[in-house]
C-alpha cells in the first residue's frame, strides 16, 4: 500500500483583523491557536486552502 504525502501546516500569525472567510478556512484545516501544527494530506483542495491563507501559515512538505 502506498504512503500518502502529508504536509505539516503551522499557524504563525494571529487571526485578529483577518477576513471572516480566512478564519473559516483556518478552522476547516483544524488549526486552533498560534503555533498549532497539523498534518494534512497533500490534496488540491488543501493546497487551495493553504494558498488562500499563506500569509498566516508556515508550511513544511
Curated annotation (Swiss-Prot):
One Gene Ontology term from the biological process aspect of the record: translation
Family statement: Belongs to the universal ribosomal protein uL30 family.
DNA damage in keyword set: no
A GO CC term attached to the entry: cytosolic large ribosomal subunit
Gene Ontology molecular function: any one: structural constituent of ribosome
Organism per entry: Nitrosomonas europaea (strain ATCC 19718 / CIP 103999 / KCTC 2705 / NBRC 14298)
Protein name: Large ribosomal subunit protein uL30
Gene: rpmD
Keywords for this protein: Ribonucleoprotein, Ribosomal protein
Pfam families given in the database record: Ribosomal_L30 (PF00327)
Domain of life: Bacteria
Coiled coil ranges: none
Assembly, per entry: Part of the 50S ribosomal subunit.
PANTHER family associated with the record: LARGE RIBOSOMAL SUBUNIT PROTEIN UL30M, MITOCHONDRIAL RIBOSOMAL PROTEIN L30
Amino acid at each position: 500500500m502506498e504512503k500518502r504525502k502529508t504536509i505539516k501546516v503551522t499557524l504563525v500569525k494571529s487571526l485578529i483583523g483577518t477576513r471572516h472567510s480566512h478564519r473559516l478556512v483556518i478552522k476547516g484545516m483544524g488549526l486552533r491557536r498560534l503555533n498549532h501544527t497539523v498534518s494534512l494530506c497533500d490534496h488540491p483542495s488543501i493546497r487551495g486552502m493553504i494558498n488562500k491563507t499563506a500569509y498566516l501559515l508556515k508550511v513544511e512538505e
